[in-house]
């Protein structure tokens, strides 16, 4: 329980469909997602890598792994927040993403932050 308070990262996600970058005829739907990462723990921690599982509504799944996020490996002191925007394309009007961040605390402790599944969905258009 003590480690949960010591190494605590909160993740919030907002998504938006990007119609200008999408091509429905080619089954390409592009979304931007903005992620806010807040260190709610008591130890400074650095985001060192990410792992995403991206699933289209048609069942196509792909995994993405890499160092940091948007070219950075942010170090978050207790109470600090880091926000970034990135994007992805899927082959259907709806899908989802989930994943994790791998973190290293300033005391050398390695831990993973789960990113709960969130929905990517083209808004309905009323005529």
Curated annotation (Swiss-Prot):
Source taxon at top rank: Bacteria
Coiled coil: none
One BP term from GO: error-free translesion synthesis
Domain ApaG residues, every copy: 3-127
Pfam families, A to Z: DUF525 (PF04379)
Entry protein name: Protein ApaG
Species the sequence originates in: Nitrosomonas europaea (strain ATCC 19718 / CIP 103999 / KCTC 2705 / NBRC 14298)
Lineage, top ranks: Bacteria, Pseudomonadati, Pseudomonadota, Betaproteobacteria, Nitrosomonadales
Gene: apaG
């Amino acid at each position: 329980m003590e480690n949960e308070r010591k190494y605590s990262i909160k993740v919030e996600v907002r998504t938006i469909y990007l119609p200008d970058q999408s091509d429905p005829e080619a089954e390409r739907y592009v979304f931007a997602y903005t992620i806010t990462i807040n260190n709610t723990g008591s130890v400074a921690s650095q985001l060192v890598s990410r792992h995403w599982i991206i699933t289209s509504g048609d069942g196509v799944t792909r995994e993405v792994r890499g160092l940091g996020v948007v070219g950075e490996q942010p170090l978050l002191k207790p109470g600090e927040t880091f926000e970034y925007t990135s994007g992805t394309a899927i082959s259907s009007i709806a899908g989802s993403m989930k994943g994790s961040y791998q973190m290293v605390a300033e005391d050398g402790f390695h831990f993973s932050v789960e990113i709960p599944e969130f929905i990517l969905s083209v808004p309905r258009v009323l005529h």
